[in-house]
């Protein structure tokens, strides 16, 4: 199972039912809607289509609303474009004017108060660089030197690297978009241009007013956000490392180190983190990714990201399906090369000690030591699954929850496969429900060893306190085990010793009522022994011990109830017999 999650931006190239189905089948876990573009009507159509297709495919796909944020842009230019030439001067006005090579205006009228002489102003993702030469507060104009030539079109982005700006946390448009998202029951809000904790709290205030349980992921895109990351994470559910504007706001050579640090801080807190922007950018135009892009995706996974994101590649590119498949293949390859033992050791040192974390550590270590097939987390809120995920176990994590909302919010968490299953409240019912659901996913089958973890008493969130090692399979009989061995073989039911004569016993488990000295030569050749006679001093027990053969004695009506020529597993340590192959300890 692929563990790293994939976020896909839905746009003109991917909004059809046919393409969304292809993206889901290729590996999309979360659909991102960019509210910098499009109307509420357009986005509602996309949400409805995503949910319709996901339901038809019986897949869980979450929806992420990405706000436009309090960005700064230029106003319109004369004839839609102007040419700025290096060495010339240009005036940036706080009053809206039609842009010319001599003067243009910006949407942020407080820019004049935030910058100072010597500050840099970057236009159109940094393609044009200006340096402030003079500030005229009376005219509301900033005179700048043009440091490099370029064309400037309408409504291009403006960045102020190293400048603390006084933009609001969210705009009125953002607030309207968030209320729309609440109405449409989106799962995540990615908050653009977050600089301080108060920006996140403004969004939380809107969510609390509407009693909405939506996770907030601030996008860190500037130096101020980087500087305040610890305080921002305290009030956030996760994080998006938005490397586009970040690479303009800070020197590009610093972006890789900042990415690693932001991911590490999220890992430490067990909060999901998305790495975004230009991951497979060339696939907007080409059917194959570059080697550098493949390395970028893989290294983000090695850094510890929970999810990787596609933007223009799926929203407007020529090869949206191929981009998702490429992302999936890189993720699977990177995960296969991980040293999960070292990863667990590193995470154990990184994460702070607590009662809940102690369970997570125990589950992850036990899963590694016993090589269990899956970890089944019965969870109301998703916290159990997230707690285990932070330790990056090699085993699959199956999150069984009665809540569709919780299942969708687990779609962003590394290594977690969410499954919706209504269940009863008792502990026994919870455990049985978890095992049955895990089998239904196809990730585990009879004979697999799994770990079940949950909170007891059931129905309460944040109480993860139980771990159970469980063997999936049909137990057909039990008795007193002799020795600690286990064996898998085909049954041979023998009412008398004559039933064993002339038989090849090398792959057989002998099932009989009792034995005497005439049975011994045959038992020596068999894989295992099951008998009805009781006691550790019985002939069967003594022969089993002396010959080192896995044996279970005291099995009631063994000859009658266990069929001939059936593959079984004997677990002598537990005194149990399972039908088929069972991965016993």
From Swiss-Prot:
GO terms for molecular function: ATP binding; kinase activity; magnesium ion binding; potassium ion binding; pyruvate kinase activity. The keyword Transferase applies. Pfam families: PEP-utilizers (PF00391), PK (PF00224), PK_C (PF02887). Mg(2+) binds at residues 221, 245. Keywords: ATP-binding, Glycolysis, Kinase, Magnesium, Metal-binding, Nucleotide-binding, Potassium, Pyruvate, Transferase. It catalyses: pyruvate + ATP = phosphoenolpyruvate + ADP + H(+). ATP binds at residues 34-37, 73, 156. K(+) binds at residues 34, 36, 66-67. Its EC number is 2.7.1.40. InterPro entries: PEP-util_enz_mobile_dom (IPR008279), Phosphohistidine_dom_sf (IPR036637), Pyr_Knase (IPR001697), Pyrv/PenolPyrv_kinase-like_dom (IPR015813), Pyrv_kinase-like_dom_sf (IPR040442), Pyrv_Knase-like_insert_dom_sf (IPR011037), Pyrv_Knase_brl (IPR015793), Pyrv_Knase_C (IPR015795). It comes from the Bacteria. The record marks 219 as: Transition state stabilizer. It is an enzyme of class 2 (transferase). Its cofactor is Mg(2+); K(+). Pathway: Carbohydrate degradation; glycolysis; pyruvate from D-glyceraldehyde 3-phosphate: step 5/5. Transmembrane segments: none annotated. Substrate binds at residues 32, 244-245, 277. Belongs to the pyruvate kinase family. This is Pyruvate kinase. The gene is pyk.
């Amino acid at each position: 199972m692929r563990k790293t999650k994939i976020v896909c931006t839905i746009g003109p190239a991917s909004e059809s039912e046919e393409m969304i189905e292809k993206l889901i089948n290729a590996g999309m876990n979360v659909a991102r809607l960019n509210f910098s573009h499009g109307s509420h009507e357009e986005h509602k159509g996309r949400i409805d289509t995503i949910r319709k297709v996901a339901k038809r495919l019986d897949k869980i796909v979450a929806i992420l609303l990405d706000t436009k944020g309090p960005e700064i842009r230029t106003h319109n230019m004369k004839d839609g474009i102007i040419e700025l030439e290096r060495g010339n001067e240009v005036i940036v006005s706080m009053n809206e004017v039609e842009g010319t090579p001599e003067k243009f205006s910006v949407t942020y009228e407080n820019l004049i108060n935030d910058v100072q002489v010597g500050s840099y102003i970057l236009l159109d993702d940094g393609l044009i660089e200006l340096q402030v030469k003079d500030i005229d507060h009376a005219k509301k104009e900033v005179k700048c030197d043009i440091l490099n030539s370029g064309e400037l079109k309408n409504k291009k982005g403006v960045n102020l690297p190293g400048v603390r700006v006084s933009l609001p946390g969210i705009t009125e448009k953002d607030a309207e978009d968030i209320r729309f998202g609440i109405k449409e029951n989106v799962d995540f809000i990615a908050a653009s241009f977050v600089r301080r904790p108060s920006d996140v709290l403004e969004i939380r205030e809107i969510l609390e007013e509407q009693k909405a349980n939506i996770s907030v992921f601030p996008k860190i895109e500037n130096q101020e956000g980087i500087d305040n990351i610890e305080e921002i994470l305290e009030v956030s559910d996760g994080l998006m490392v938005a490397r586009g504007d970040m690479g303009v706001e800070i020197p590009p050579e610093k972006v890789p180190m900042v990415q690693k640090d932001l991911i590490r801080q999220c890992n430490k807190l067990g909060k999901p983190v998305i790495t975004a922007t230009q991951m497979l950018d060339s696939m907007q135009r080409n059917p194959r990714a570059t080697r550098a892009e493949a390395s970028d995706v893989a290294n983000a996974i090695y850094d510890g990201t929970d999810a990787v994101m596609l933007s223009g590649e799926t929203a407007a590119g020529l090869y949206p399906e191929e981009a998702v498949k490429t992302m999936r293949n890189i993720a699977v390859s990177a995960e296969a090369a991980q040293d999960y033992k070292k990863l667990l050791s590193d995470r154990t040192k990184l994460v702070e000690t607590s009662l809940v974390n102690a369970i997570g550590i125990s589950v992850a270590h036990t899963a590694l030591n016993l090589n269990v097939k899956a970890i089944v987390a019965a969870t109301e809120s998703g916290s159990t699954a997230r707690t285990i995920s932070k330790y990056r176990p090699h085993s699959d994590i199956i999150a069984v929850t009665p809540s569709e909302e919780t299942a969708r919010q687990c779609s962003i968490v590394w290594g977690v496969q969410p499954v919706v299953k209504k269940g009863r409240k008792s502990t026994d019912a919870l455990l049985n429900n978890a095992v049955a659901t895990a089998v239904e996913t196809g990730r585990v089958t009879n004979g697999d060893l799994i770990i079940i973890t949950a909170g007891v008493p059931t129905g309460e969130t944040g109480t993860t306190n139980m771990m159970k090692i469980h063997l999936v399979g049909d137990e057909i009989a039990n008795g007193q085990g002799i020795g600690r061995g286990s064996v898998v073989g085909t049954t041979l039911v023998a009412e008398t010793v004559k039933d064993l004569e002339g038989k090849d016993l090398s792959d057989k488990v002998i099932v009989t009522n009792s034995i005497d000295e005439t049975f011994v030569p045959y038992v020596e050749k068999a894989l295992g022994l099951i008998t009805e006679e009781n006691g550790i001093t019985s002939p069967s027990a003594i022969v089993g011990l002396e010959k080192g053969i896995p044996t279970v004695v005291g099995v009631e009506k063994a000859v009658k109830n266990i069929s001939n020529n059936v593959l079984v597993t004997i677990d002598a340590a537990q005194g149990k017999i399972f039908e088929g192959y069972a991965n016993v300890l």
